[in-house]
Amino acid sequence: MNFTKTLAMRIISFLAIFISSCTGAFAQNWDWGGPIDPLQAKMKIRHYRLELELLPETQSIQGSNTITFSAEEKLDTLRFQLINEYEISKVLMDGKEVKFTHEKDLLDIIPVDCTCDQVQIFYGGKNPIAQNPPWTGGFTWEKDLLDNHWMGLSSQGEGGKIFMPALDHPSSEPSEGVDLIFTAPKPYFVASNGRLIESQEVGQKMRYHWQTGYPISNYNINFTLGIFHEEKLDFTSVSGEVIPMQVWVLQENRAKVKELLELLKISTETQEKYFGPFPFSEDKIAVVETPYLGMEHQTINAYGNNFQFVPMGKVKYDWLLHHELGHEWWGNKVTVSDWADMWIHEGLTAYGDWLFFWEHGGPEAYFAKVKAESRNVPHAKPVVSPPNSTEEEAYHPEIYTKGALVIHALRGVLGDELFFPAIKAFVMDERFTYLNQVTTRDFTDFIQSYTGKDLKGFFDLYLYTTSIPKLKVSKKGKEGYVISLQGIDFEMPLEIETSEGVQRAPVGKKGIEVKSKTPPVVDPQGWLMLSR
């Protein structure tokens, strides 16, 4: 999600939760991440098979999750997370009921004496209602203009435990993907991750079976219920693969669906140019209209931006559509295991938003965007949070705009001939994608190795501190100027515009001397974050 457009909503969310708690309404904090539970560190999730009946009239769910797992040793306890708002009716292993406890959102299961690698958990109950989706998540039950039910789920800040039992930690993704089977009353449709492999009438209900073989984060497992109009096309990727591209919108918005699909196509082409082929070619490229702003759910991006298309060069641009799509590369393909490194998801995706300006609006639009966004950086926290951070601890403004400005500055330091190949090489490297989750050090070490540049000082400064170098320009003689960067012990290349033209030179605290009949303009394009 985009922070600069949502800071006010975060404040509203806080006030809403505070007021509701004062009036006795239910409010809960379901943060996730941090140090992994020692019991869960012994276990790897291979697959989830989630089978749910969605009950709009009671705003509840009923069903089961079958979890396939592996462990290097025999486990005395299987520990999963599921919020206590749901009631567990039974747990099966090897076809037999087993003992369990369900307290404080933790589900502890005592396995039977077998070589079982599966457990099926039956549960159900009223859905937790989102206080301010997607920032304070949960289920959002609304009605469309025709008085039909319309439900969306958001859980980035809460994890999967608000809708299914799971090993709920960002380091845990099912290595063999998920099967998602939803039953809903006719004529409702349920849009979800992966490909729809079967839809079946069951009396007065519809059953939809979605499937993906890709690993997927718990918060990206998602489903949206409604009566939708669908538009689709076959998208030819730069890889040569033909991928289904699908858009689902409410019936009242069907007149806008073709343009939304065309914008999705343009955004995908733009993302592919800079970051390589769409990462989930076996599934689909898709968005579904949701009763909240949006989220990067894998292969089924949530879209609630009310079709706010703006001109950009010869095309149109929808910031929400493009941003959430960008997460398919940064967040869903390249994924962190510790929320401390969350900026890799948000900063790189935000920079991809700026590249749309570069690609379609040209340099003038790009630099204007960078200048405008740079005003939104408080420099209050380091971009990278302390190790083992929770989602709430790691989610702050710096991971968005400052993260993107770090990447922008990296481009300025390296130059386009090194920068663009390096970024694409990282996102295409199998060592850092899908199940091979990454850290900030993985990224910074790779960039230095790929480019052959020593960037340790640069990365340490901008990612791990709140300090900004002080630009100092001092007059020396009639036409001389000394230019230096105070507060750093390394040099960074600066563009310097003098009466003789533009030169590029490494500058540090010792400074360099330039000759100019007019005061020099340092870093005229604004590549670096400097105190001026």
Positions of PLM-derived features:
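N-terminal, polar/Ser/Thr-rich
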Residues: 26-62, 89, 142-150, 456-457
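Extended, low-hydrophobicity, Ser/Thr/Pro/Gly-biased non-transmembrane segments
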Residues: 122-228, 526-528
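Acidic/His/Gly-enriched intrinsically disordered linker/tail segments
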Residues: 346-405, 409, 413, 432-433
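Zn2+-dependent metallopeptidase catalytic core
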Residues: 65, 70, 114-116, 122, ...
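A surface-exposed beta-strand-loop module
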Residues: 77-78, 83-142, 205, 512-515
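Juxtacatalytic substrate-recognition/specificity segment
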Residues: 180, 209, 229-328, 332-341, ...
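Beta-strand-rich binding/interaction modules
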Residues: 76, 87-92, 455, 477-525
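Amphipathic alpha-helical substructures
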Residues: 396-476, 481
